[in-house]
Regions:
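N-terminal intrinsically disordered, low-complexity segments enriched in P/E/S/T
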Residues: 1-128
Length: 128
């Protein structure tokens, strides 16, 4: 099971697997990005805020969260954006598991630029 490293949320190394995400309170949302690249999707996953609450944290506790993919793509999200937007760690799109071009997790941020929708997520760095 693929592991997503969660850097900076505890003194010890932290990570979450897709299996662990699926065991959490999952949601399915229908949304689209504000750019034309992706269109409307029905995404299934968990909110990053729910993962953080397991550590007693909230998105707004951080000045920056940077999401990295295995392809070395990264998308930094800053405090104001983090306070105003929900971030989903999606493991399914349109009722299907993610394909290998997106797995293990894809970021979905409703009504935001698709540039933030990082694919193949393997690491999330949290900075206070």
């Amino acid at each position: 099971d693929a592991e997503i490293a969660l850097e900076g949320i505890s003194d010890e190394s932290a990570a979450v697997t897709v299996k662990q995400l699926k065991a959490m309170d999952c949601h399915t949302i229908k949304t689209e990005s504000t750019s034309d690249k992706i269109g409307v999707v029905k995404a299934t996953g968990v909110w990053l805020s729910d993962v953080l609450s397991e550590y007693g944290l909230e998105q707004g506790d951080f000045s920056r969260i940077t999401i990295y993919g295995t392809d070395e793509y990264s998308a930094p999200l800053y405090k104001d954006f983090l306070k105003e937007n929900r971030i989903m760690l999606a493991f399914g799109i349109d009722g299907q598991p993610l394909d290998e071009d997106s797995a293990p997790v894809r970021i979905i941020i409703p009504e935001s630029e698709s540039a933030y929708w990082t694919r193949m997520v393997n690491r999330i760095k949290f900075e206070k």
